[in-house]
From Swiss-Prot:
Coiled coil: none annotated. Belongs to the potassium channel family. G (TC 1.A.1.2) subfamily. Kv6.4/KCNG4 sub-subfamily. The transmembrane segment S4 functions as a voltage-sensor and is characterized by a series of positively charged amino acids at every third position. Channel opening and closing is effected by a conformation change that affects the position and orientation of the voltage-sensor paddle formed by S3 and S4 within the membrane. A transmembrane electric field that is positive inside would push the positively charged S4 segment outwards, thereby opening the pore, while a field that is negative inside would pull the S4 segment inwards and close the pore. The keyword Ribonucleoprotein does not apply. This is Voltage-gated potassium channel regulatory subunit KCNG4. A motif (Selectivity filter) lies at residues 418-423. Residues 241-261, 315-328, 391-405, 426-432 are extracellular.
Length: 519
């Protein structure tokens, strides 16, 4: 690492790598750890003999950062009067000096700092050359902490490095938000009444594990497989019910054997979904929070059309007659037809058992700003190209499909999204030039937010996958610890604090290694 010499040049003085800065907590603001004065100097002196020749403090300063010695002229620090090194020049006593550094050797007039030597090497290069960049081998947030310690503003960073730092700060803010949500959820869970030792509490724990955690055991896996099977059956039944022959019978108010079988299948599926919804409601700890869940709202929207159809039917089936599924929608008109089409929402129930669908929902929630920017870009481009293609086609005398500017909006949408149905095609050369510009602009506009959305999707998928692996590892650990207690196996909240800490340590040892983030 190049270092300043006594005559203002750069030369290496000593290369010993000391200890780095302590780790900061991931979701807390950076805090400076108080050091024990006097220990760092003695620790360095034990390593090797350093050049103890005193320096002239009026012209230069001798500092030792992590075992590396630097000799800097005071004139190098004139541009940064608020930096930590510049403040050392104003100190008049040993007490004032140790407030700014970790230790001070009065014999050699050497200042000691227990900080990262690699980061300070970059700062030294910045003081000498005026260019400040991030270290590739160091976390951007750790480097930000080093800059704050030495009193160097982040605005001096190069533009590309500053953008990288801002992205890291946004990721940290998102992690802090998720952490707060997890803490609030855990607080809500700990507020429930302590009834675990009762038989009712044990039954609720078993039921909760079965309906919410398919990996908890054989009952949970069977319950999840049945739920997926009924969802697939409902989707197939809905598709078959739209066949032309069945639609003709429905329009005529008739019901054949096929229609009867479809109605029976639909009834069985709705009965299962209703039972599953009731079980989830019974085991829910917070009933109000249960009805606010997105998947629970989808369940209500998917199940209710069947019961609404039964309630509004004016001709209920009599005893001995075959109930007709189509007769329930015959006299309710378009509203019930739309409600019946909502049965396709059953497919969204697969999100309870699909990690990919859960990742998709989490990505949509995290990328609301990116989706908003995408819609904004499309709206601006559509507003720009629609009048242009309308004017180009109108002036050429070939106005066929482009009857107005609002009618041209549809053409701009399908062109910029590269769909191109072909129902509206510009015929003139100016119109075709506008179409070419619209298509190229659409490709660029769609590509800008897509990169960020893809990055968020990959990050969310790895995050959910890691949480699932940790949960499975914890369940395996609890099952292998022997007959601790049935209550502890069913509900982790009643486990002792010592056992929970052991579980966390086992997860760290068993799970795949993750990169350590220095803050």
């Amino acid at each position: 690492m190049p270092m300043p010499s006594r005559d203002g040049g750069l030369h290496p003085r000593h290369h010993h790598y000391g200890s780095h800065s302590p780790w900061s907590q991931l979701l807390s603001s950076p805090m400076e750890t108080p050091s024990i004065k006097g220990l760092y100097y003695r620790r360095v002196r034990k390593v090797g003999a350093l050049d103890a020749s005193p320096v002239d403090l009026k012209k230069e300063i001798l500092i030792n950062v992590g075992g590396r010695r630097y000799l800097l002229p005071w004139s190098t620090l004139d541009r940064f009067p608020l930096s930590r090194l510049s403040k050392l020049r104003l100190c008049r006593s040993y007490e004032e000096i140790v407030q700014l550094c970790d230790d001070y050797d009065e014999d050699s007039q050497e200042f000691f700092f227990d900080r990262s030597p690699s980061a300070f090497g970059v700062i030294v290069s910045f003081l000498a050359a005026g260019k400040l960049v991030l270290l590739q081998e160091m976390c951007a947030l750790s480097f930000q902490e080093e800059l704050a310690y030495w009193g160097i503003e982040e605005a001096h960073l190069e533009r590309c490095c500053l953008r990288k730092l801002l992205r890291k700060l946004e990721e940290l803010e998102e992690l802090a938000k998720l952490h707060r949500e997890d803490v609030l959820r855990q607080q809500r869970e700990t507020r429930r009444p302590a009834s675990h030792s009762s038989r009712w509490g044990l039954c609720m724990n078993r039921l909760r594990e079965m309906v919410e955690n398919p990996q908890s055991g054989l009952p949970g896996k069977v319950f999840a497989c049945l739920s997926i099977l009924f969802v697939a059956t409902t989707a197939v039944s809905l598709c078959v019910s739209t066949m032309p022959d069945l639609r003709a019978e429905e329009d005529q108010g008739e019901c054949s054997r096929k229609c009867y079988y479809i109605f029976i299948v639909e009834t069985i599926c709705v009965a299962w979904f209703s039972l599953e919804f009731c079980l989830r409601f019974v085991q829910a700890q917070d009933k109000c929070q249960f009805f606010q869940g997105p998947l629970n709202i989808i369940d209500i929207l998917a199940i209710s059309p069947y019961y609404v159809s039964l309630a509004v039917s004016e001709e209920p089936p009599e005893d001995g007659e075959r109930p007709s599924g189509s007769s329930y929608l015959e006299k309710v008109g378009l509203v019930l037809r739309v409600l019946r089409a909502l049965r396709i929402l059953y497919v969204m129930r697969l999100a309870r058992h699909s990690l990919g669908l859960q990742t998709l929902g989490l990505t949509v929630r995290r990328c609301t700003r990116e989706f908003g920017l995408l819609l904004l870009f499309l709206a601006v481009a559509i507003t720009l190209f629609s009048p242009l293609v309308y004017v180009a086609e109108k002036e050429s005398g070939r106005v066929l499909e482009f009857t107005s500017i609002p009618a041209s909006y549809w053409w701009a949408i399908i062109s910029m999204t590269t769909v191109g149905y072909g129902d509206m095609v510009p015929r003139s050369v100016p119109g075709q030039m506008v179409a070419l510009s619209s298509i190229l602009s659409g490709i660029l506009i769609m590509a800008f937010p897509a990169t960020s959305i893809f990055h968020t999707f990959s990050h969310s998928y790895l995050e959910l996958k890691k949480e699932q692996e940790q949960l499975q590892a914890r369940l395996r650990h609890l099952q292998n610890t022997g007959p601790a207690s049935e209550c502890e196996l069913l509900d982790p909240h009643v486990a002792s604090e010592h056992e929970l800490m052991n579980d966390v340590n086992d997860l760290i040892l068993e799970g795949p290694a993750l990169p350590i983030m220095h803050m």
